[in-house]
Swiss-Prot record:
Residues annotated as domain GATase cobBQ-type: 252-439
One Gene Ontology term from the biological process aspect of the record: cobalamin biosynthetic process
UniProt key word Isomerase: no
Family according to the record: Belongs to the CobB/CobQ family. CobQ subfamily.
Function: Catalyzes amidations at positions B, D, E, and G on adenosylcobyrinic A,C-diamide. NH(2) groups are provided by glutamine, and one molecule of ATP is hydrogenolyzed for each amidation.
Recorded metabolic or biological pathway in which this protein acts: Cofactor biosynthesis; adenosylcobalamin biosynthesis
Active site: C334 (nucleophile), H431
Natural source organism: Hyphomonas neptunium (strain ATCC 15444)
Gene3D superfamilies: 3.40.50.880, P-loop containing nucleotide triphosphate hydrolases
Protein name: Cobyric acid synthase
Matching CDD domains: CobQ_N, GATase1_CobQ
MF-aspect GO terms: ABC-type vitamin B12 transporter activity; catalytic activity
Domain of life: Bacteria
């Protein structure tokens, strides 16, 4: 089998590429096609674990779900996980290969391009259709000579492109026409069509502009996607969306999460944000954690020691310790769990610069960073309730200490996490727990009696994916979109 393929690129970050791909994947699956998502290169600290112990971007895991598939490393062959302002861990085919500065990474682009094309070839041999997501914008012409995420991939693989513009941020006409103006003519020839995303109001008012864009670019207009409420119910991928999240409001339980500088896998909060009983909000840098919250949730981070120092620089350590002294609840997940302990040690510089830092001291545990990374799906039982749980681990530390004798979970691989003697401070390495309805309801009930609900998170995600697909079908020429897909090797321009 040789699949057809089509690529969605955007005029910038956060224009909605990830959810557009997810919606088109669900549409293709509903039409009976075997379809797979593909993102050549992603930059995100939100990762998902694959069954074989690899990791990919969580956006590709959601797109896989839209296809009816489990996450696979070929869906995102290169994942960059920022560790500092200048360095990132490079994940290739699901496995960490190096931590590099930008210049060193660029020197490896030929090797990485080979890894990308290798994964793409495997997918095109297995599926009817591959829907590809670009990264950022193809108009970043300063990066074009080393690009493997946008036109560098599209031209190497011969995949036609649809360009998405975000009208909500303004300037969408300039963004689309400007992209055509600044990119290489051979790159522009790869673009077959465009669409407008996140429109509010009467789309008829924009129809004349659609004709203008078609005339100025030579690209076909596929339509105008309105602001779809389903998109807000699906997991956000990156920090751009995180900064735009507002408090959910109205719930009986108030949960605050400090916005760490290298926060990772913050989609652990999505099921809580969807709960009617929960008022969940992120606390941005420079603001104190309110005193009246019921729970402080410390998320994972790509740089535990670095974010421990960042947390202290914001004064959040004082807020967290005061919360604990007054009987408040605290839960740490992954790196957040590590921070709750007494010491964080990184003798080999696995997590950043080598060294050690005191933790918050709320759990009698110590963590040592190790080069061997643990990445795996897990199943087990909640130690407090005995309920079955499942999730995944992605971490590089080993945590030991007296409080670990009171584990948070019982897993076949051994006990996980720790609980303080009074039961109010808890930590776990396992992500994805709150996506399970029974566990989430029991945990909320333990925080405050009568606060649990019968919300079904998994079903709500499936419903949102279907609504997203319905919205695309109602407002875009989806038949034309699928007709544009071509067999790999198609050439709209010389490579």
């Amino acid at each position: 089998m040789t699949a057809r393929a089509i690529m969605i690129q955007g005029t910038g970050s956060d224009v909605g590429k990830s959810l557009l791909v997810a919606g088109f994947c669900r549409l293709a699956a509903r039409r009976g096609l075997s379809v797979a998502p593909f993102k050549p290169q992603n930059m995100s600290n939100n990762a998902a674990a694959t069954a074989d112990g690899g990791e990919i971007g969580r956006a590709q895991a959601l797109q896989a779900r839209a296809c009816g598939l489990d996450p696979q490393t070929d869906f995102n062959p290169v994942l960059l996980k920022p560790q500092s302002d200048c360095t990132a861990q490079v994940i290739v085919h699901g496995r960490p290969t190096a931590t590099l500065e930008a210049a060193d990474y660029m020197a490896r682009r030929d090797t990485l391009r080979g890894a990308v094309l290798e994964s793409f070839a495997r997918l095109t041999a297995r599926f009817d259709l591959v829907i590809v997501e670009g990264a950022g914008s193809p108009a970043e012409i300063n990066l074009r000579d080393r690009d493997i995420a946008n036109m560098g991939f599209a031209r190497a693989a011969g995949v036609p492109v649809v360009l998405a513009g975000d009208i909500d941020r303004g300037g969408v006409i300039a963004a689309l026409v400007g992209t055509k103006t600044v990119i290489d003519p051979a790159d522009a020839a790869m673009i077959r069509a465009f669409l407008i995303n996140k429109f509010r109001g009467d789309p008829a008012l924009f129809e004349p502009a659609m004709a203008d864009i078609e005339r100025m670019t030579g690209w076909a207009g596929l339509g105008i996607v309105p602001w779809l409420s389903a998109a807000a119910r699906l997991p956000a991928e990156d920090g751009v969306a995180l900064e735009q999240m507002r408090p959910t409001g109205g719930g009986r339980i108030r949960i605050a999460a400090p916005m760490l500088s290298r926060i990772a896998n913050f989609d652990d909060a999505d099921p809580l944000r969807a709960e009617p009983s929960v008022d969940f909000f992120f606390v941005p840098p420079g603001q104190a954690i309110p005193r009246d919250v019921d729970v402080i949730l410390l998320f994972g981070t790509k740089s535990t020691l670095g974010d421990m120092a960042f947390l202290r620089a914001q004064g959040w350590d004082h807020d967290i310790l005061a919360h604990a002294r007054t009987g408040g609840r605290i839960l740490g997940i992954c790196g957040g769990y590590q921070m709750l302990g007494q010491w964080l040690c990184d003798p080999e510089g696995v997590d950043g610069a080598a060294g050690e830092l005191p933790g918050l001291g709320l759990l009698k545990t110590d963590t040592t960073m190790q080069g061997e990374k643990t990445v795996r799906p897990v199943t087990g039982q909640c130690a407090r309730t005995g309920l079955p749980v499942s999730g995944y681990e992605i971490h590089a530390g080993l945590t030991r200490g007296p409080d670990a004798a009171r584990p948070f979970l019982h897993l076949p691989e051994g006990p996980d996490g720790a609980i303080s003697p009074d039961g109010r401070v808890e930590g776990t390495y396992v992500h994805g727990l709150f996506a399970q309805d029974a566990f989430r309801a029991a945990w909320l009930e333990n925080v405050r009696a009568g606060a649990s609900s019968d919300a079904a998170y998994g079903a709500s995600v499936e419903a949102a994916l279907d609504e997203l697909a319905d919205g695309l079908e109602a407002h875009l020429d989806v038949d034309r979109f699928f007709a544009l897909a071509a067999a790999p090797g198609w050439r709209g321009a010389p490579s």
